[in-house]
């Protein structure tokens, strides 16, 4: 039987942006954009695991530097402009649950393109989600 782990945050950061090349690692006030999302998730009082799903070894290296777990490099079929976030998040969660024989109770999907989101915003959203017993928020 799998042991229950609470909340996982999956940060989705694909390298092949068509509009703004490598937008997820562009510097904002001296830090790569994805660092802000990793930091907020790591500082959250509600999130137990912070995982970066990326197709880029460079993004993985940067993500690891800021404290994200990098359990895999995202498969190419999930790293196209036509890939859907639910498929990417499902891949990440299933990969970890199967590898570690654990089960997450809740999943938080985060994108690096919201750098002004702070840990307390995440905690407020998670509290609202749990209190109202919603399916999603």
Language-model features and meaning:
Residues 1-21:
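N-terminal nucleotide-binding beta1-loop-alpha1 segment
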Residues 37-103:
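Conserved N-terminal catalytic core of the sugar/cofactor nucleotidyltransferase
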Residues 107:
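Short aromatic/hydrophobic "clamp" motif used to bind/position activated sugar donors
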Residues 110:
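Catalytic metal- and UDP-sugar-binding loop of GT-A-like glycosyltransferases, i.e.
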Residues 85-87, 92, 96, 118-137:
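Conserved donor-nucleotide/metal-binding helix-loop-beta segment in metal-dependent transferases, i.e.
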Residues 20-43:
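Short, well-formed alpha-helical segments that are part of the catalytic scaffolds
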Residues 9, 50-52, 136:
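Hydrophobic/aromatic residues located in beta-strands of well-ordered beta-sheets
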